């Protein structure tokens, strides 16, 4: 039996009408007991394109951390009391112990609002 090259097979299949190729695929699936499915193609991307794919899911809960009370401690204490509902002594102790977590696991919107109030009072705030 003469050996047929891969190139000859490709040339032969290239000249067949699409209908005959579809029938050939069905015949091969039946003979081999497999199902033809589109192959997942892996595309090599450059580092710039890979960065978005590696991005972690967006964080939904944040800890509001008072990093530094700044020079207006009284204003920051008032803001802490408003945000947390703490008493005067507890709020003062929290402000003086900075860096300290003010609230844990709050939504992004609430965390941003708390940060805004504290920054307006003169504090340095981090969202973690």
Curated annotation (Swiss-Prot):
Q: Which InterPro entries match?
A: Ribosomal_bL12, Ribosomal_bL12_C, Ribosomal_bL12_C/ClpS-like, Ribosomal_bL12_oligo, Ribosomal_bL12_oligo_N_sf
Q: List the disulfide bonds.
A: none
Quote the cellular component terms of the Gene Ontology held in the record: cytoplasm; ribonucleoprotein complex; ribosome
| Key words of the record | Ribonucleoprotein, Ribosomal protein
MF GO annotations? mRNA binding; structural constituent of ribosome
One Gene Ontology term from the biological process aspect of the record = translation
Q: What does this protein do?
A: Forms part of the ribosomal stalk which helps the ribosome interact with GTP-bound translation factors. Is thus essential for accurate translation.
Subunit text: Homodimer. Part of the ribosomal stalk of the 50S ribosomal subunit. Forms a multimeric L10(L12)X complex, where L10 forms an elongated spine to which 2 to 4 L12 dimers bind in a sequential fashion. Binds GTP-bound translation factors.
Query: Which family does the similarity line name?
Result: Belongs to the bacterial ribosomal protein bL12 family.
Matching NCBIfam families: L12
Protein name stated in the entry: Large ribosomal subunit protein bL12
Q: Which organism is it from?
A: Sorangium cellulosum (strain So ce56) (Polyangium cellulosum (strain So ce56))
């Amino acid at each position: 039996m003469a050996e047929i090259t891969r190139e000859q097979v490709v040339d032969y299949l290239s000249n067949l009408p699409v209908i005959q190729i579809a029938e050939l695929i069905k015949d091969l699936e039946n003979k081999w007991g497999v199902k033809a499915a589109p192959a997942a193609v892996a595309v090599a991307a450059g580092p710039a394109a890979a960065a978005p794919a590696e991005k972690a899911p967006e964080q939904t809960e944040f800890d509001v951390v008072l990093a530094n009370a700044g020079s207006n401690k009284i204003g920051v204490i008032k803001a802490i009391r408003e945000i947390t509902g703490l008493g005067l002594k507890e709020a003062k102790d929290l402000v003086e112990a900075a860096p300290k977590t003010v609230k844990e696991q709050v939504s992004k919107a609430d965390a941003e609002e708390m940060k805004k109030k504290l920054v307006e009072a003169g504090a340095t705030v981090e969202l973690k």
